[in-house]
Regions:
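Extended C-terminal regions of large enzymes
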Residues: 367, 376-443
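Short, charged alpha-helical motifs in flexible N/C-terminal segments and linkers
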Residues: 39, 43-51
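Conserved polymerase palm-domain catalytic core
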Residues: 69-84, 88, 120-282, 287
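A conserved non-catalytic segment of reverse transcriptases
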Residues: 191, 267-335, 340-342
């Protein structure tokens, strides 16, 4: 009852600067647009099991009832459903999946807060923002490096989304969200709890990844850090919780590491992972990695490169998609490779990597030939297909009856000629070298 009365008092005393922000959030057009965005993003049900498709008729019938409860201060968001996603380093990333109704409400709030905060966010913030990308962040680091900022402070925040201090966040929100009812509604989402193994656990800190509002709140929180270092004249590039500060000397970067760690831990009550946070030259290929990229320099200047760990992951995934076990039917495998490789190149296409791409492209052609050779199975089938593709009969017979391993035979000159690039491309092969040239030309 106390919370309800407080909400009613807030409703009467709301600041006149944004007297109808809550009404704007709950306006039918905004709400409908929010549902369409949630539907487009797809996603799993929350703790109530309601799917996105099932939510539409429910909202049509109950939308007025939901908005009335919010206006009266009686709406209580459902706890989020805990989901754990494995991380490459062996740990897990904890996600909190809200119900579809709560995702829609969070999206409706986000749509009205974004225009307010886009005017306030620092230029160096790139994550979860309209018309900004990881590529923009990387190109900004390159621009600073060309100006002599070649030493980096790489800051690693431990479990950032799970450790946002609610009191600090609410006070930050109040600076620019003048309708206190909206602040209180956001607070209810922060305090909604997490259901884990059938038990609801209170959330005293954090904004679980998985909600539509969480990315914006994460940016609002760390905007305090961005603005502080902007005032100090320090180049700060941030993508969500990946932070890089830049300096012109090793000594200056060491001072920055100390001061930034102190600010994050004392002012924002976050935990800096001291083992992973460090000062390093931006050209240290093994030690400097930002958003999967690294930097190099030669006689022509500074260039963007793909970090070795990103290369390793890329090749490992291609190897998995082109394994002999997966290539029982070659066309579906080629389509999966195309979808994955196209997405990878769209992200990493800003990097200079012609030689590396050529090497991987040749290796991938070899693997696809190996898959096709295995798919042909019997010597008789191999012989018929080789002859059909223009290989002389006596040579085709020798190759078809060879007991050499798939990898060796698939690199035979006759097999390479029979299954040449043009034929494989016509069958659906995604030529990495050609695709790279088309995406890299813009950089």
């Amino acid at each position: 009852m106390k919370a309800s009365r407080s909400f009613h008092r807030i409703w009467k005393e709301r600041d006149s600067a944004q007297p109808r922000l809550l009404e704007t959030i709950l306006y039918k057009d905004n709400f409908n647009r929010a549902y369409k965005r949630v539907k487009a993003n797809k996603g799993a049900p929350g703790i109530d099991g309601m799917t996105i498709e099932e939510a539409l008729p429910y909202l049509k019938e109950h939308q007025q009832e939901i908005t009335d409860r919010i206006y009266r201060g009686k709406y209580t968001p459902s706890p989020v459903r805990r989901v754990e996603i494995p991380k490459p380093d062996g740990g897990v990333r904890k996600l909190g999946i809200p119900t579809v109704i709560d995702r829609t409400l969070q999206q409706a709030i986000t749509q009205q807060l974004v225009p307010i905060y886009e005017l306030l966010f620092a230029e160096g913030s790139y994550g979860y923002r309209p018309n900004r990308s990881a590529k923009d962040a990387i190109l900004k680091v390159k621009e600073y490096a060309e100006q002599g900022y070649t030493f980096a402070v790489v800051l690693d925040l431990s479990k950032y989304f799970d450790t946002l201090n609610h009191e600090i966040l609410i006070n930050i929100l109040r600076k620019n969200v003048k309708d206190e009812r909206v602040v209180q509604l956001i607070k209810r989402y922060l305090k909604s709890g997490v259901m884990e193994n059938g038990v609801v656990i209170d959330t005293e800190e954090g904004s679980p990844q998985g909600g539509n509002l969480s990315p914006l709140l994460a940016n609002i929180y760390l905007n305090e850090f961005d603005q502080e270092y902007l005032k100090r004249g320090v180049p700060c590039i941030r993508y969500a919780d990946d932070i890089v500060l830049l300096a012109k000397s090793k000594r200056a970067s060491e001072r920055l590491l100390e001061s930034s760690t102190k600010y994050l831990e004392e002012r924002l009550k976050l935990t800096v992972n001291r083992e992973k946070s460090r000062t390093v030259s931006v050209f240290a290929i093994r030690n400097f990695k930002f958003l999967g990229f690294a930097f190099g320099r030669n006689g022509k200047g500074i260039y963007v490169r793909v970090h070795p760990k990103s290369w390793k992951k890329f090749k490992s995934r291609l190897k998995e998609l082109s394994s002999r076990k997966r290539c029982q039917s070659i066309k579906p495998s080629l389509e999966k490779i195309k979808v994955y490789a196209r997405g990878w190149l769209n992200y990493y296409g800003i990097a200079s990597m012609k030689n590396n791409i050529d090497d991987i492209n040749g290796w991938l052609y070899h693997r696809i030939r190996m898959c096709i050779w295995k798919q042909w199975k019997k010597p008789r089938t191999k012989y018929k297909n080789l002859v059909k593709l223009g290989i002389p009969e006596h040579y085709a017979a020798t190759i078809a009856n060879s007991r050499r391993k798939y990898w060796y035979i698939s690199n035979n000159k006759a097999v390479i000629w029979a299954l040449n690039k043009e034929r494989l491309i016509n069958s659906g092969f995604y030529d990495l070298a050609t695709a790279y040239q088309s995406v890299h030309v813009n950089y």
